[in-house]
Design a protein with these regions (language model features):
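Structural beta-strand segments of beta-rich domains
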Residues: 47-51
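Short, hydrophobic beta-strand segments
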Residues: 92-104
Length: 345
């Protein structure tokens, strides 16, 4: 996003507006990853990006030291900007710089100027990449189901402990402003409820292009969560990781009394972990899961598929079960979140 109307905002370094030597800034472009192909809108806090400023004529080497750069954060304009540095590198009639911005909450503006202060209408704007974790509970989790609950299992035993891990990460590895988690009932991840319960919340955070989605679902929440991965992908969101904890929903009876999809899920994901509960001795919750129909996906499709001797209700134990060397689902989820936020593009 550049200045609104170049003719209204041309910045002149000379006091003589009629002089042939007058030089002024026409526009600023960026950020670019490397070359001047297409600027990107969403950036990582952990990388430098290229910016270019263009003038009405070739900038002389002697004038380069007069060129300054500044930044303002979020909704602040140039009056609240901070000076960054002077100069840059001459390149094909423009001046190139590389800047890393790590402060701010959601966005920042880069200014280039020749006068004493930045011009409020000559800037380019960028936004920080964001990531969201959707924790989706099963029957009776977020609200009562058939006279039982709510148990809040996925929130108390999975979401809250994971969010606590997020909060202790070093700032140079993960900025808390870039992560958000949402607690959902399985029925909130169903058909037209997705727009009001999920899409509306995601729209408050970032556009699909600047957002990665992580889905963690238990029981019916795993079944609907797997469907959700396909639905959100169709809406241009990126599904970074899908974690299904003993997903349930294959039997016809449960589809008649629950807001779940009848067809088997066609999941779309970058990485999928499926954990199936198979206790040696069944308890009440295991019989309920059996009646609902435990989903056993094709074992070749998930990146990790393990069977554990935990009861269906023990989502926390499933989530922290070692599945890849010394790593559990929580570790892998954290790694994917950090990898996305740390990637340059």
């Amino acid at each position: 996003l550049n200045g609104e109307d170049d003719s209204d905002v041309l910045e002149n370094v000379s006091t003589n507006s009629n002089s042939d030597n007058d030089i002024y800034i026409i526009k600023i472009e960026g950020p670019f990853v490397n070359s001047k192909t297409n600027p990107i809108k969403y950036v990582s806090r952990f990388h430098k990006y290229r910016y270019y400023v263009y003038f009405n004529r070739q900038l002389k080497q002697s004038e380069l030291k007069s060129l300054k750069w500044a930044v303002s954060f979020d909704d602040n304009d140039s009056t609240s900007s901070f000076f960054l540095f002077s100069s840059g590198t001459l390149e094909n009639g423009a001046v190139r710089v590389e800047i890393k911005i790590s402060e701010g909450i959601n966005s920042f503006r880069i200014y280039s100027y020749l006068g004493g202060v930045p011009n409020n209408k000559i800037y380019t704007e960028a936004f920080f990449k964001k990531t969201v974790a959707l924790f989706i509970g099963g029957a009776g989790d977020k609200e009562a189901y058939a006279g039982t609950g709510p148990t809040n299992i996925i929130q108390l035993e999975v979401q809250n402990p994971f969010d606590s891990i997020i909060t202790i990460q070093p700032q140079e590895q993960l900025n808390l402003n870039d992560y958000k988690s949402l607690y959902l009932g399985y029925n909130e991840a169903y058909k037209n409820k997705i727009a009001s319960n999920i899409i509306s919340e995601l729209n408050k955070i970032a556009e699909p292009k600047g957002l990665s989605i992580n889905i963690i679902g238990h029981s019916l929440g795993g079944w609907n969560g797997a469907h959700l991965s396909q639905i959100l992908t169709r809406s241009k969101y990126k599904i970074e990781i899908l974690i299904t904890l003993d997903p349930v929903g294959t039997k016809e009876g449960v589809t008649l009394v629950s807001d779940i999809y009848r067809p088997y899920p066609y999941s779309i994901y970058k990485y999928w972990i499926n954990i199936q509960s198979s206790p040696t001795q069944y308890e009440a919750d295991d019989y309920i899961a059996w009646l609902g129909g435990q989903w056993e996906p094709d074992k070749e499709k998930p990146n990790n598929y393990i069977i554990v001797d935990y009861h269906h209700r023990e989502a926390s134990k499933m989530f922290t079960e070692k599945i890849a060397g010394n790593f559990d689902s929580s570790d892998i989820l954290l790694a994917h979140i950090q990898s996305y936020l740390n990637a340059k593009i």
